[in-house]
């Protein structure tokens, strides 16, 4: 026999706390756009799908970190070299020669950002000269089309289809008045004529308090359809 508390719980309108299925909760059913729905991969996350389709999940810069691209192999060089090889002296000699060759390379001031500088040293570590950068972050004289062409990435097929869909001409369908609306406008016209102010203050016919401008637009459309000349 159940207790009084259990019987009250069974009669209560508050639903029981049941276990939710996370897979059903997270599943996305795309119905808004057929192009995106056809190319959506449900095994990927939303951000991964947007990146695959050539779209952006967020218009602004992401506040947090980005997902690591595992397709690119980044080789990490240790800061300190372990002393394991017998040919350490030869390696050090090669490193010094490489450093000297790098130091003798001419630095281009047009490749260094404006406001920054590069120090050029000799093989002994002494400063030879300081090269100040002249490369501007944004050139006002540069053509806008060149900037756009440089910044834009290659469009995917999904983006091209979406642009074609968005560029189609939209056929505007004019709103038609219903029979009840025409009967209501006819009553207003027979009672008040072209006096839209009296129509506005008519509490029996104008129960939804339509404004004078709205009543005028509706009546002009109704007159045009019924062939009534406007005064």
Swiss-Prot record:
Residues 85-98 have a biased composition (Acidic residues). Keywords: Nucleus, Phosphoprotein, Ribonucleoprotein, Ribosome biogenesis, rRNA processing. Pfam families: Nop16. Its main location: nucleus. One of its GO terms (biological process) is rRNA processing. Residues 1-30, 77-120 are annotated as: Disordered. The modification Phosphoserine is found at residues 176, 178. GO terms for cellular component: nucleolus; nucleus; preribosome, large subunit precursor. It is found in: Nucleus, Nucleolus. Residues 1-10, 17-27 have a biased composition (Basic residues). Component of the pre-66S ribosomal particle. Interacts with NOP7, RRP1 and RRP15. Belongs to the NOP16 family. Involved in the biogenesis of the 60S ribosomal subunit. Present with 2860 molecules/cell in log phase SD medium. This is Nucleolar protein 16. It comes from Saccharomyces cerevisiae (strain ATCC 204508 / S288c). The gene is NOP16.
């Amino acid at each position: 026999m159940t207790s009084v508390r259990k019987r009250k719980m069974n009669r209560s309108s508050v639903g029981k706390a049941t276990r939710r299925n996370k897979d059903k909760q997270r599943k996305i059913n795309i119905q808004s756009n057929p192009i995106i729905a056809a190319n959506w991969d449900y095994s990927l996350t939303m951000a991964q799908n947007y990146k695959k389709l050539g779209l952006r999940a967020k218009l602004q810069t992401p506040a947090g970190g980005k997902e690591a691209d595992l397709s690119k192999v980044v080789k990490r060089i240790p800061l300190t070299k372990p002393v394991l090889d017998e040919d350490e002296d030869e390696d050090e000699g090669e490193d010094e020669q490489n450093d000297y060759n790098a130091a003798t390379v001419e630095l281009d001031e047009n490749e260094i950002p404006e406001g920054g500088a590069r120090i050029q040293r000799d093989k002994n570590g002494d400063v030879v000269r300081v090269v100040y950068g002249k490369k501007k972050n944004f050139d006002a004289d540069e053509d806008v089309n060149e900037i756009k062409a440089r910044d834009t990435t290659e469009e995917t097929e999904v983006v091209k289809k979406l642009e074609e869909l968005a560029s189609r001409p939209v056929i505007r369908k004019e709103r038609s008045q219903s029979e009840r609306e025409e009967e209501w406008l006819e009553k207003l016209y027979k009672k008040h004529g072209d006096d839209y102010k009296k129509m506005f203050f008519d509490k029996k016919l104008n129960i939804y308090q339509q404004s004078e401008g709205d009543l005028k637009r509706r009546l002009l459309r109704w007159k045009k359809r019924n062939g009534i000349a406007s005064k």
